[in-house]
Amino acid sequence: MVLSGALCFRMKDSALKVLYLHNNQLLAGGLHAGKVIKGEEISVVPNRWLDASLSPVILGVQGGSQCLSCGVGQEPTLTLEPVNIMELYLGAKESKSFTFYRRDMGLTSSFESAAYPGWFLCTVPEADQPVRLTQLPENGGWNAPITDFYFQQCD
């Protein structure tokens, strides 16, 4: 089955900070200028070129007009690239730099970079900080990166 459009999800980290777009950056927080933030609609499609059993997904914002990318450098850097999510979905390339393996763990999910195994989407405990990538720490202290997300389909 081929999708005609991306699926819509909202994401919160396990500390209940919502993901939202501000100045072309994906941040995690709850209040902005005293107003509760609803959270960005995250466009999601599967990556049809990678092993489906690993749940490979491509994540986009702004209606899928920009996609999360890990880049192609020595170490991954999370950026938003102006690429249409449906072009990645329908294209004939692996698009690993745009792909994350979604792992469900009960009510939450983690997202591991397909291009950089061992690197995960994360937030930090402080509010209104950029979403980034991290390697899982050996022991998580109070300021450890948060790699678990609630991932719920839009209403």
From Swiss-Prot:
GO molecular function: cytokine activity; interleukin-1 receptor antagonist activity; interleukin-1 receptor binding
Domain of life: Eukaryota
Entry comment describing in which tissues the protein is expressed: Predominantly expressed in skin keratinocytes but not in fibroblasts, endothelial cells or melanocytes. Detected also in the spleen, brain leukocyte and macrophage cell types. Increased in lesional psoriasis skin.
Disulfide bonds: 8-154
Compartments it resides in: Cytoplasm; Secreted
Keywords, alphabetical: Cytokine, Cytoplasm, Disease variant, Disulfide bond, Immunity, Innate immunity, Secreted
Main subcellular location of this protein, as a coarse class: cytoplasm
Swiss-Prot/TrEMBL induction comment: By phorbol ester (PMA) and bacterial lipopolysaccharides (LPS) treatment in macrophage cell line. By Aspergillus fumigatus conidia in peripheral blood mnonocytes.
GO biological process, one term: antifungal humoral response
Record note on quaternary structure: Interacts with cargo receptor TMED10; the interaction mediates the translocation from the cytoplasm into the ERGIC (endoplasmic reticulum-Golgi intermediate compartment) and thereby secretion.
Disease: Psoriasis 14, pustular: A life-threatening disease defined by repeated flares of sudden onset consisting of diffuse erythematous skin eruption characterized by rapid coverage with pustules, high-grade fever, asthenia, marked leukocytosis, and elevated serum levels of C-reactive protein.
Main function: Inhibits the activity of interleukin-36 (IL36A,IL36B and IL36G) by binding to receptor IL1RL2 and preventing its association with the coreceptor IL1RAP for signaling. Part of the IL-36 signaling system that is thought to be present in epithelial barriers and to take part in local inflammatory response; similar to the IL-1 system with which it shares the coreceptor. Proposed to play a role in skin inflammation. May be involved in the innate immune response to fungal pathogens, such as Aspergillus fumigatus. May activate an anti-inflammatory signaling pathway by recruiting SIGIRR.
Family label: Belongs to the IL-1 family.
Stated name of the protein: Interleukin-36 receptor antagonist protein
Organism field: Homo sapiens
Gene that specifies this protein: IL36RN
